[in-house]
């Protein structure tokens, strides 16, 4: 076998190997291309995934921010509701406290009213007792028994219950004048006003039903007394009739009787008419009330200081007060430095003489 013949199979194998190698190289390039494309695609996919993740993170961040705003808004609403609820609770507590305070005030006012009513009842009882008591050596101006009839008392009670008293439960000065007009056509307003101020029960110028009945009874008594004293029924009182009446009332000193007559005889006619008598009676009733209030120890005597104090409280004119020292010594004939009711009346008459 020649060399060529022996080499041919080898060449054929080499060609086949070269062909296979070329084929492998071609396939390797294709595989590499495929791998390169897959790698590129994978990188693109990874990039896309990253982009998606970033987008998702942005969405998550936005959602978290939105949730925070919602949470803050919700917390603010809750805080506002809590404040409103606290305010309502505080308002309710204040309302309850105000109602409680109002009830306490009302209870205190009721207690005070009950105390005032009891004190007023005691004051009136003491006053009426003083007016009726003859233990000090003088009598009151009115008779011992009530002068108001049952019908008159019912009229006063109806007036008290009616709206004519302005719903206050007490009488004004005009109410008093209206009631007393039943007993006399003309009642001097000056002394009546003084009497009203002395016995009014509050600072608003009103008197209670009990006080009105007492005052009306006194006025009715004055009318009845005048008719009884006027023995000849001529409508006036002579000096003799006047003096005899006041002796019965305990004014036994002639000087006092004469002073009373001069005071009552305003027109200097030497007799005392009905209106003059009522005027005097009202003035004496005012003085009797002043004296009774000042005589705290019920001794029937007022010291000089007590007399001066009661006259100051009565707001007498300055011109009359200037006469006090001199006239007190004139009236206090026994130099006891105190005055009985009769001497007290005489003192006032002298102080107001020519005023």
Curated annotation (Swiss-Prot):
Residues bound to Ca(2+) 4 are: 332, 334, 336, 338, 343
* Protein residues bound to Ca(2+) 2: 265, 267, 269, 271, 276
What Gene Ontology molecular-function terms does this entry list?
A: calcium ion binding
**Which keywords does this Swiss-Prot/TrEMBL entry list?**
Calcium, Metal-binding, Repeat
What domain of life does the UniProt record list for this protein's source? Answer: Eukaryota
Residue ranges constituting the EF-hand domain according to the UniProt record:
151-186, 217-252, 282-317, 319-354
Binding of Ca(2+) 3, residues: 295, 297, 299, 301, 306
Pfam family of the protein (one)? EF-hand_5
Which Gene3D superfamilies does this UniProt record tie to the protein? 1.20.58.90, EF-hand
Any further remark recorded for this protein:
This protein has four EF-hand homolog domains inferred to bind calcium.
What is the name listed in the Swiss-Prot or TrEMBL entry for this protein?
Plasmodial-specific protein LAV1-2
